[in-house]
Amino acid sequence: MCPLRSLLLISTLVLLHHLPHLSLGRSLPTTTASPGRSCLDYSQNLLRAVSNTLQKARQTLEFYSCTSEEIDHEDITKDKTSTVEACLPLELATNESCLASRETSFITNGRCLASGKTSFMTTLCLRSIYEDLKMYHVEFQAMNAKLLMDPKRQVFLDQNMLAAIAELMQALNFDSETVPQKPSLEELDFYKTKVKLCILLHAFRIRAVTIDRMMSYLSSS
């Protein structure tokens, strides 16, 4: 019989993947990181940071259609990463009977697993998460540069969120090519930039929930 924990995880991942209109305004419980922080600690910190940033943006940009019901949902990782598929529990991804044994473990450099050993499928999952974080980090940095040019200085990104992304990426510790930031040649439109900020924050919070669920599953496995 399939482990109940695995079934609950896959149900959550599929729900988050197919319901982008999921309510995003709920407050999150405060957690205390244990000594020698794990990727679960970092993912929880990231989820709090992006939730706080989104809440502030919705309050500041209340006249910019910044609620989940009003925005046009967009996934910048579409066709570039496959986190939901890569992060399926191994017993569900490799064998419908859920009796498949774990693949041979090997050494990884990241701090996400205390032993430093993980299966091939888990490594694919963590790498996909890393690639997601990298893409969003680049997008947010480029967008923040535009927002800082706005004479109104109405809204800009919380540095705590950018730091939380960088911390989790560092903990995952995958080698990856640097994503070049291509400067936009179009005329700056601060209204469109602020609407785009809302779209990215909503999408990233959904991805942060998925990442946190996966880290929780891995830490309890």
Swiss-Prot record:
Keyword tags: Cytokine, Disulfide bond, Glycoprotein, Growth factor, Secreted, Signal
Gene Ontology biological process terms in this record: immune response; positive regulation of biosynthetic process
GO cellular component: extracellular space
Disulfide bonds: 39-112, 66-198, 87-125
Keyword hit for Glycoprotein: yes
Pfam families, per the entry: IL12
Matching InterPro entries: 4_helix_cytokine-like_core, IL-12, IL-12_alpha
Glycosylation site residues: 95
Entry's localization field: Secreted
Molecular function per GO: cytokine activity; growth factor activity; interleukin-12 receptor binding
Record has Nucleotidyltransferase as a keyword: no
Residues of the signal peptide: 1-25
Chief localization: secreted
Record function comment: Heterodimerizes with IL12B to form the IL-12 cytokine or with EBI3/IL27B to form the IL-35 cytokine. IL-12 is primarily produced by professional antigen-presenting cells (APCs) such as B-cells and dendritic cells (DCs) as well as macrophages and granulocytes and regulates T-cell and natural killer-cell responses, induces the production of interferon-gamma (IFN-gamma), favors the differentiation of T-helper 1 (Th1) cells and is an important link between innate resistance and adaptive immunity.
Family that this chain belongs to: Belongs to the IL-6 superfamily.
Complex formation: Heterodimer with IL12B; disulfide-linked. This heterodimer is known as interleukin IL-12. Heterodimer with EBI3/IL27B; not disulfide-linked. This heterodimer is known as interleukin IL-35. Interacts with NBR1; this interaction promotes IL-12 secretion.
Protein's UniProt name: Interleukin-12 subunit alpha
Species this chain originates from: Bubalus carabanensis
